Amino acid sequence: MDTMTAEGLLLPWPDDDGEPFWEHARRGELRIQACADCGRLRFPPRPCCPQCGSFDDEWRLMSGRGRLWSYVVAHPPLLPAYAELAPYPVALVELEEDPRIRLVGTLTNSVRRPGAPWNAVPPGRLRIGAPVQAVFQVLTPEVTVVRWALCSG
């Protein structure tokens, strides 16, 4: 598996527990690991439920809706490919289904533009609590990443 895109961006390197997350993302689905016994959602994926200790899990389909819980604006100096995109916001999003589940990703300015440049959302538009929607950007035939589209309202 490649470690970088043709543009020099780092690709995710999933472990065994996280591979299903990336597999579902390739299909355009946001799925989160859940305990098959007690139902607790967990992210990042891990082998054992932190609530009941069960090793049985399932991957539940999420709505993709969430809220901006926090963000940071990345500035140079960074790796060369990232420096060319900076400054750009990186979001921490809490999912609508469970606010304890938070995912990191870059933002896009429209659900219709999953491949928009990372700096497409001006940092001045960002507000904690702003609604976002998951979108999926294909980076390589093997890797699709979850990004977050800033929603109006």
Task: Label the predicted regions.
Residues 29-32, 45-46:
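Residues immediately within or flanking Cys/His clusters that coordinate Zn2+
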Residues 34-37, 48-54:
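Short, cysteine/histidine-rich loop/knuckle motifs that typically chelate Zn2+
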Residues 3, 100, 104-153:
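Well-ordered alpha/beta subsegment
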Residues 1-30, 143:
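A broadly conserved sequence feature marking short terminus-proximal activation segments
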